[in-house]
Amino acid sequence: MNIFADFDARIKKTLQDIDLKPKDGGELDLSRIGVEPPRDASHGDIATNAAMVLSKAVGQNPRELAARIAEALKADEDVESVDVAGPGFINLRLKASYWQRELLVMLNEGTDFGRSRLGAGKKVNVEYVSANPTGPMHVGHCRGAVVGDVLANLLKFAGYDVVKEYYINDAGAQIDVLARSVMLRYREALGESIGEIPAGLYPGDYLVRVGQELAGEFGTKLLEMPEAEALAIVKDRTIDAMMAMIRADLDALNVHHDVFYSERKLHVDHARAIRNAINDLTLKGHVYKGKLPPPKGQLPEDWEDREQTLFRSTEVGDDIDRPLMKSDGSFTYFAGDVAYFKDKYDHGFNEMIYVLGADHGGYVKRLEAVARAVSDGKAKLTVLLCQLVKLFRNGEPVRMSKRAGEFITLRDVVDEVGRDPVRFMMLYRKNDAPLDFDFAKVTEQSKDNPVFYVQYASARCHSVFRQAADQLGLVDLDRVAMGSHFEKLTDESEIALVRKLAEYPRLIESAAIHQEPHRLAFYLYDLASSFHSQWNRGAENPDLRFIKVNDPDLSLARLGLVQVVSDVLTSGLTIIGADAPTEMR
């Protein structure tokens, strides 16, 4: 249960009980009332701004109103004390019995604790990675892959019906260049000396194998075909090979998509999907024939100094109108974006999230304009931009050669440090802030390495369970037994740990609402820190050890507390896509 939602309801009922009314009549607007943890834990367990946001409406000084509300809240059987602070904040401290009851709820729910109905089954499409199928994924793709994947997992846990999607950019000019690059490698595999790879083609050695496979399958047949026919075959085989490589890289990172949507699908039957999308916009009055003034700076490839078919995107929030069709009748890349969005919307998605690299910042307004125009404002589209990842080794920047074809791949990083450190650390900064990734730091065993610190807490929980088996003979810990004596958990440090656990449902919902999966990584680190601190207290004070051989009931209660810590760590790490180890190796 979300205890903050619980007390939000209790506080609003209290406002009704004291018959609080607006001075001008009508009903009070309670929507701005906030109920959250105090910024300073010493101030209490629950804080609310109710008096401050309602004082003007009821015509009463905020502190006086706060005192009135506070007095009424003292009647709540779970409230130990109520204080008014600052300009009118109300801080509540709850009784230990309340936390003991809540801990029992957490224990009974297991790893489902924190799962929410917030999404109410609403369909959400999360598109992420969508790297061009022209080669292996580099480290720059890694952050978006993790952010998108964890956000999708988080939304599922919060009750949304989520589809993870990858858009395969397999219809652009870069694919033609890729096919010609592989054709060269094919000729090389047949024994021809190709010399240095010509400028403009893909030089990477990863294409050598594709050329060899084509040579093994076709022999010299492709050379005997008309060039267009041969290139079409090479293109299909190469896209399949590149996507197989990309899927393998993503699998190594524990990233899995539900849908792989081919851009070429939009161009089937003379680009029927694109034509239908443009016709739909035309019927709504969003399309016209016109000529755009030349933009400042470098000219985009879809600008022409002649009449084009244009989208009135400025009428729906964009900076400039956008070309949909060139003067020669061919469609712009942007027209494909329109058709792709319409396809999602037609499949019942009213909420779509695009996770893109920071270099796509210029696309945000045009994509939002498409969403408004296609859905008549009914669909919500959010674009999350992921800033760059800078690689370091022992604090020194990792130099990458600018020579063509040489870069650090996603697989290089995963193979060196492991999947879990990569996933966790890619979340340890908000997506729109640059991130430094140090190969040495993410593998060191210290508090300064967040993923180690969190996974070590999970392992320590299980070490407590093993100690219980050795010292108390409790091999199969029973949750009913562990939860039967929570009234024995009275030490302030134990109650503080329960408070931290109780924040989890609110954390899940707030991270889902704001689409900020990094909040989960931060919370898990804080929870791990609280648990390690409790462990250390037991090392310093025998009375606070998790296992008291001479007090089996207290031991069971503390084991129940450890079990809930383990459950929440497991739940959070599962959402992140990392393991919750039972021991460190």
Swiss-Prot record:
Belongs to the class-I aminoacyl-tRNA synthetase family. HAMAP family: Arg_tRNA_synth. GO terms for molecular function: arginine-tRNA ligase activity; ATP binding. A motif ('HIGH' region) lies at residues 131-141. It catalyses: tRNA(Arg) + L-arginine + ATP = L-arginyl-tRNA(Arg) + AMP + diphosphate. SUPFAM superfamilies: Anticodon-binding domain of a subclass of class I aminoacyl-tRNA synthetases, Arginyl-tRNA synthetase (ArgRS), N-terminal 'additional' domain, Nucleotidylyl transferase. It is found in: Cytoplasm. SMART domains: Arg_tRNA_synt_N, DALR_1. Pfam families: Arg_tRNA_synt_N, DALR_1, tRNA-synt_1d. NCBIfam families: argS. Keywords: Aminoacyl-tRNA synthetase, ATP-binding, Cytoplasm, Ligase, Nucleotide-binding, Protein biosynthesis. The lineage of its organism: Bacteria, Pseudomonadati, Pseudomonadota, Alphaproteobacteria, Hyphomicrobiales. Its EC number is 6.1.1.19. One of its GO terms (biological process) is arginyl-tRNA aminoacylation. PROSITE patterns: AA_TRNA_LIGASE_I. It comes from Brucella melitensis biotype 1 (strain ATCC 23456 / CCUG 17765 / NCTC 10094 / 16M). Monomer. This is Arginine--tRNA ligase. The keyword Heme does not apply.
